């Protein structure tokens, strides 16, 4: 039986954790997740998905939510669990060396390393319009996602996929890859990352959702990447809640309404065009785009801004 201490926080990590629980060859000896955080307008204290899964499926498994990993007691308690491995998936904090030294630490990073090291690899892959993504199992060491690679799983990104769908696909691939690496760990010949090929992605900021009608394909890719948060919005703070890419070519006045029909509002970009289906004005409810432009008395040839 392979003894695993698991560290993770969001739904991506929950999928991996549940695969470990349902494996007959793995024993999860402890779960570490971020502390509960206020969520929504009411700021209700909400447990992360990994904690919810732990309480539902394995309520007797030791569960830890440390504020500060550098406190000596955490390394002491986790070492006492005698894990063979520490599996880390989107935990959200950098692990100090004292924890890395407890047992081999395997991180499931949602990119093909060394591409997109850092906090938002899935969003970055969509924002750049990549045709492929994937997950990497990496032997952790001090530094940001720079350890030796133990295995990868590739995923072809379909054009209609947004961030939620790609998250789901990568989580399933990561779960399968985790079990494979744990079972074959002693046989694997790790591959060092080539630093010259590396790229980095930071934590997403709200202002990155600001868009303009310059390039239709790039705007659509921003929508795919940021649909969950922060969303995409114009300078007027009008949120574009649902859009589709019509054409990557064709030159238009930026924001010009090209057509209004039952399928939505077609808007031109400096390069290409989009169909807008749903929008949301500041402090208003989400409405279909046709109702919005009709309410604003906008017609074909007018500018949406």
From Swiss-Prot:
Enzyme Commission number(s) of this protein: 2.1.2.9
Statement: the UniProt record of this protein carries the keyword Protein biosynthesis: yes
Enzyme class, UniProt record, top EC level: transferase
A Pfam match: Formyl_trans_N
A GO MF label: methionyl-tRNA formyltransferase activity
Source organism superkingdom: Bacteria
Binding locations of (6S)-5,6,7,8-tetrahydrofolate: 111-114
Gene Ontology, cellular component aspect: cytosol
Assigned keywords, A-Z: Protein biosynthesis, Transferase
Alphabetical list of CDD domains matching this protein: FMT_core_Met-tRNA-FMT_N, Met_tRNA_FMT_C
SUPFAM superfamilies: FMT C-terminal domain-like, Formyltransferase
InterPro entries in the record: Fmt, Formyl_trans_C, Formyl_transf_N, Formyl_transf_N_sf, Formyl_transferase-like_C_sf, Met-tRNA-FMT_C, Met-tRNA-FMT_N
Reactions catalysed according to its record: L-methionyl-tRNA(fMet) + (6R)-10-formyltetrahydrofolate = N-formyl-L-methionyl-tRNA(fMet) + (6S)-5,6,7,8-tetrahydrofolate + H(+)
Family listed: Belongs to the Fmt family.
Role description: Attaches a formyl group to the free amino group of methionyl-tRNA(fMet). The formyl group appears to play a dual role in the initiator identity of N-formylmethionyl-tRNA by promoting its recognition by IF2 and preventing the misappropriation of this tRNA by the elongation apparatus.
Protein name as annotated: Methionyl-tRNA formyltransferase
Source organism of the structure: Wolinella succinogenes (strain ATCC 29543 / DSM 1740 / CCUG 13145 / JCM 31913 / LMG 7466 / NCTC 11488 / FDC 602W)
């Amino acid at each position: 039986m392979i003894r695993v201490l698991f560290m993770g926080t969001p739904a991506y990590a929950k999928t991996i954790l549940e695969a470990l629980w349902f494996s007959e060859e793995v024993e999860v000896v402890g779960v570490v997740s971020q502390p509960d955080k206020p969520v929504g307008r009411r700021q209700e204290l909400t447990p992360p998905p990994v904690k919810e899964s732990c309480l539902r499926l394995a309520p007797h498994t030791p569960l830890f939510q440390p504020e500060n990993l550098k406190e000596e007691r955490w390394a002491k308690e986790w070492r006492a669990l005698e894990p063979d491995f520490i599996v880390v998936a989107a935990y959200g904090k950098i692990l100090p060396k004292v924890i890395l030294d407890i047992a081999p630490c395997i991180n499931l990073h949602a990119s093909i390393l060394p591409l997109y090291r850092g906090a938002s690899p899935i969003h970055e892959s969509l924002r750049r319009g990549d045709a492929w993504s994937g997950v990497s199992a990496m032997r952790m060491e001090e530094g940001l996602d720079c350890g030796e690679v133990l295995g990868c799983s590739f995923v072809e990104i379909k054009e209609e996929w947004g961030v939620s769908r790609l998250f789901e696909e990568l989580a399933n691939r990561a779960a399968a890859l985790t079990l494979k690496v744990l079972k074959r760990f002693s046989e694997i010949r790790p591959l060092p990352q080539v630093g010259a090929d590396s790229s980095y992605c930071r934590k997403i900021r709200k202002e990155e959702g600001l868009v303009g009608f310059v390039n239709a394909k790039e705007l659509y890719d921003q929508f795919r990447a940021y649909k969950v948060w922060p969303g995409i919005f114009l300078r007027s703070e009008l949120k574009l809640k649902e859009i589709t890419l019509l054409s990557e070519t064709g030159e238009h006045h930026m924001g010009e309404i090209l057509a209004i029909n039952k399928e939505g509002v077609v808007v031109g970009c400096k390069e290409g065009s989009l169909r807008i289906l749903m929008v949301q004005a500041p402090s208003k409810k989400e409405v279909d785009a046709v109702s919005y432009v009709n309410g604003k008395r906008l017609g074909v040839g007018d500018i949406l801004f």
